[in-house]
C-alpha cells in the first residue's frame, strides 16, 4: 500500500488497517507509542536510511542576516533539545535521542549516493510507477 505521507503510514497501523509497514520517518511511530499505541520500530541490521532536514541560507536571499540568525537558532541548544521530545533525532551529537530510541551511533546507516540517484532519477521514477500503478 502506498500512501501520501509519513503520518498516513502510522495512522494505518494505529487504526489496525495494517500490521506492519515500511517507513522512513520514525517520528510518527514514536508519537503513537507515547500515546499508548503498541507500535514498535525495527532498525534493520543491514542498515537504515538517515534523512537529514537541512537549514540553509539561500544565496541572494533578501534578508541574509535574518536567515543566518534563523539558521543559528535552529541548531541552538534551545531548539535541538526540543526535538527529541517530539520523536525527532537532533542534528547534534551532544543531544540525547528520543526516549526509548537508540543513539544514532548504534544504528547502522546505509550510505546514500545522491549523485547516482540524481543521474538515475528519471529511470527510478519510471520503474516506481511501473511497479505501483
Language-model segments: residues:
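Binding-cleft/active-site segments that stabilize strongly anionic ligands or cofactors
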Residues: 50, 63-64, 76-77
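Solvent-exposed, acidic/flexible segments
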Residues: 2-7, 60-67, 117-121
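A bilobed periplasmic-binding-protein/Venus flytrap-type ligand-binding module shared by bacterial periplasmic
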Residues: 52-63, 82-83
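Periplasmic-binding protein-like
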Residues: 73-97
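Short beta-strand->loop
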Residues: 33, 37-49, 58-60, 99
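Ligand-binding pocket segment of bilobal, Venus flytrap-like solute-binding proteins
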Residues: 1-44
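Extracellular/periplasmic bilobal clamshell ligand-binding domains
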Residues: 99-133
Amino acid at each position: 500500500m502506498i500512501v501520501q505521507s509519513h503520518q498516513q503510514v502510522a495512522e494505518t497501523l494505529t487504526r489496525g488497517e495494517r500490521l506492519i509497514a515500511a517507513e522512513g520517518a520514525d517520528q510518527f511511530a514514536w508519537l503513537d507509542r507515547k500515546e499508548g499505541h503498541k507500535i514498535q520500530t525495527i532498525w534493520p541490521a543491514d542498515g537504515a536510511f538517515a534523512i537529514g532536514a537541512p537549514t540553509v541560507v539561500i544565496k541572494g536571499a533578501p534578508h541574509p542576516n535574518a536567515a543566518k540568525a534563523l539558521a543559528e537558532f535552529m541548531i541552538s541548544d534551545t531548539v535541538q533539545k526540543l526535538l527529541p521530545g517530539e520523536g525527532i533525532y537532533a542534528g547534534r551529537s551532544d543531544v540525547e535521542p528520543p526516549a526509548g530510541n537508540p543513539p544514532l551511533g548504534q544504528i547502522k546507516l546505509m550510505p546514500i549516493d545522491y549523485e547516482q540517484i540524481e543521474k538515475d532519477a528519471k529511470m527510478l521514477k519510471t520503474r516506481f510507477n511501473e511497479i505501483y500503478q
